[in-house]
């Protein structure tokens, strides 16, 4: 059972950004490029949430749930994301992206499955797949920063 001490932030998001502004600037540039990439904003948020769920990053899950809600991503897609394979609410393109997200996020546990690559490739051009993979890699990087430092999740209405 977690204690208050075991969930206390080790470093806050704002403090992290102030400590390494060059990193924050670089990540913001990647985010800006991805926003202009043509990959649907709703899909980008779904993959960010899914990778963050897998990596156990509370800050990133909440941050991207907030963004997804602002984009009016249907509630059932957010509610069922952890069980997306069985949910039946995702398009084939979304399902392929979510499967690819899991393949890339869990890279250390297995090699990338050729069949998963073939499935995602039928729904994404070469450029789109490269951009999708950059987006997945970026959120994995953020997860590996935010989770160890226990950034406080940005819960709407909570004092930050």
Residue ranges of predicted features:
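Hydrophobic alpha-helical segments
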Residues: 1-160
């Amino acid at each position: 059972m977690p204690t208050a001490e075991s969930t206390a932030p080790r470093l806050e998001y704002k403090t992290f950004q102030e400590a390494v502004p060059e990193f924050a600037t670089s990540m913001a540039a990647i985010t800006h490029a991805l926003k202009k990439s043509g990959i649907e904003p709703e899909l980008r948020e779904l993959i960010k949430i899914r990778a963050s769920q897998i990596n156990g990053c509370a800050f990133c899950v909440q941050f991207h749930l907030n963004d997804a809600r602002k984009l009016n991503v249907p509630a059932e897609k957010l509610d069922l994301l952890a069980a997306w394979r069985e949910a039946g609410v995702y398009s084939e393109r979304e399902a392929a992206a979510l499967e690819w997200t899991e393949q890339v996020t869990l890279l250390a546990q297995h090699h990338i499955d050729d069949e998963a690559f073939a499935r995602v490739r039928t729904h994404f051009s070469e450029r789109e797949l490269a951009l999708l993979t950059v987006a997945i890699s970026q959120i994995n990087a953020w997860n590996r920063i935010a989770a160890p430092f226990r950034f406080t999740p940005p819960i709407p209405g909570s004092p930050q």
